Structure formats: C-alpha cells, structure tokens
Swiss-Prot record:
GO cellular component: cytosol
Family note: Belongs to the IF-1 family.
Top-rank taxon, per record: Bacteria
Intracellular or extracellular location(s): Cytoplasm
S1-like domain residues: 1-72
Originating species: Paracidovorax citrulli (strain AAC00-1)
Function: One of the essential components for the initiation of protein synthesis. Stabilizes the binding of IF-2 and IF-3 on the 30S subunit to which N-formylmethionyl-tRNA(fMet) subsequently binds. Helps modulate mRNA selection, yielding the 30S pre-initiation complex (PIC). Upon addition of the 50S ribosomal subunit IF-1, IF-2 and IF-3 are released leaving the mature 70S translation initiation complex.
GO molecular function: ribosome binding; rRNA binding; translation initiation factor activity
Keywords associated with the record: Cytoplasm, Initiation factor, Protein biosynthesis, RNA-binding, rRNA-binding
Record Pfam families: eIF-1a
Annotated protein name in UniProt: Translation initiation factor IF-1 1
HAMAP family tied to this protein: IF_1 (MF_00075)
Subunit structure: Component of the 30S ribosomal translation pre-initiation complex which assembles on the 30S ribosome in the order IF-2 and IF-3, IF-1 and N-formylmethionyl-tRNA(fMet); mRNA recruitment can occur at any time during PIC assembly.
Amino acid sequence: MSKEDLIEMQGKVEEVLPDSRFRVTLDNGHQLIAYAGGKMRKHRIRVLAGDRVSLELSPYDLNKGRLTFRHIEGRGPRAPQRGAR
C-alpha cells in the first residue's frame, strides 16, 4: 500500500493503554485504537491523555491507526511534507 492510500485524520487521545497504544476519538466522533509511529518512538515523543494528535488510517481497517504527530498548544499545524529525496 502506498502512502497516498492512507487516510489522514485528527483527534484527541482519550486514554493511554499498555504497549504504547492509545484510545483516540476522532474529530468526527469515531473511536479507535492507535499506536505510536516509528519516528515518534525513535525520538521518544511522549503522548498523554488529552493531547491533540494527527494519525493515519488504512482504508481497509478504520478501527486501527498510527499516530504521526502530536500537536502542541500555541504551535500551528505541521507543514506539508516534501517528496522523498
């Protein structure tokens, strides 16, 4: 599956679960289980209950997601990513 096939959404972390998983409520009200993406683990980005996050969903399973960005209050949305080098 290519990166273009993923659905990008935003939501709020409701609960921190074991094994670096999180219960997230999307802006449209849908709840799902998400895990921290590889770069978030690598850079030890801490995600707490109540944080606003961006996540990617597979079009094949809308009940699981991958956290890709933690939004910090007072900072604007992240810049769009450039293509691969």
